[in-house]
């Protein structure tokens, strides 16, 4: 995996109940199940458990279900939202965190029911309220997806 941490530090975990206080998303669109570690303003690692009960599998594809790439990208974007809130604090009532742009998206392998996506996002820079991140998603230690993400908090 890309993000390396010191072996002697205790991981910072955020459970789904706290994630629901950080993000406005709800079923079926909350795509971050747990944060397994993060460092404010730098990086975050989270998981998304993919089950056969995901609503997308009724049509993508019923006889051979594959988790849609766009939902992997959305999961990475939601992970950046958790990192932003963990870094800068909870959003105001009238504020939203938007997925603004994506570049260089690459899908390396299919993600299927039973897989656990390990999402890794790293802060790159912020310019005029737009924050740029790089994101990667792994299954069993193998890269499934990578992309550059831009998000805005307004």
From Swiss-Prot:
Its EC number is 4.2.1.59. It is an enzyme of class 4 (lyase). SUPFAM superfamilies: Thioesterase/thiol ester dehydrase-isomerase. It catalyses: a (3R)-hydroxyacyl-[ACP] = a (2E)-enoyl-[ACP] + H2O. It is found in: Cytoplasm. Keywords: Cytoplasm, Lipid A biosynthesis, Lipid biosynthesis, Lipid metabolism, Lyase. One of its GO terms (molecular function) is (3R)-hydroxyacyl-[acyl-carrier-protein] dehydratase activity. Disulfide bonds: none annotated. The keyword Chaperone does not apply. InterPro entries: FabA_FabZ, FabZ, HotDog_dom_sf. GO terms for biological process: fatty acid biosynthetic process; lipid A biosynthetic process. GO terms for cellular component: cytoplasm; membrane. Transmembrane segments: none annotated. CDD domains: FabZ. The active site is at 60. Its main location: cytoplasm. Pfam families: FabA. Involved in unsaturated fatty acids biosynthesis. Catalyzes the dehydration of short chain beta-hydroxyacyl-ACPs and long chain saturated and unsaturated beta-hydroxyacyl-ACPs. Belongs to the thioester dehydratase family. FabZ subfamily. This is 3-hydroxyacyl-[acyl-carrier-protein] dehydratase FabZ. It comes from Haemophilus ducreyi (strain 35000HP / ATCC 700724). The gene is fabZ.
């Amino acid at each position: 995996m890309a993000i390396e941490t010191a072996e002697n530090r205790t991981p910072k975990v955020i459970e789904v109940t706290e994630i629901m206080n950080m993000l406005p998303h709800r079923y079926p669109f909350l795509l971050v199940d747990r944060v397994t570690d993060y460092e404010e303003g730098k990086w975050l690692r989270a998981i998304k458990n993919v089950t056969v009960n995901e609503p997308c599998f009724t049509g993508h594809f019923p006889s051979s279900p594959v988790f849609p790439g766009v939902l992997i990208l959305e999961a990475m974007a939601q992970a950046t939202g958790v990192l932003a809130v963990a870094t800068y604090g909870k959003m105001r009532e009238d504020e939203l965190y938007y997925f603004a742009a994506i570049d260089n998206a690459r899908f390396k392998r299919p993600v299927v029911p039973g897989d656990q996506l390990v999402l890794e996002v790293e802060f790159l820079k912020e310019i005029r309220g737009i924050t740029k991140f790089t994101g990667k998603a792994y299954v069993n230690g193998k890269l499934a997806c990578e992309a550059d993400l831009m998000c805005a908090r307004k």
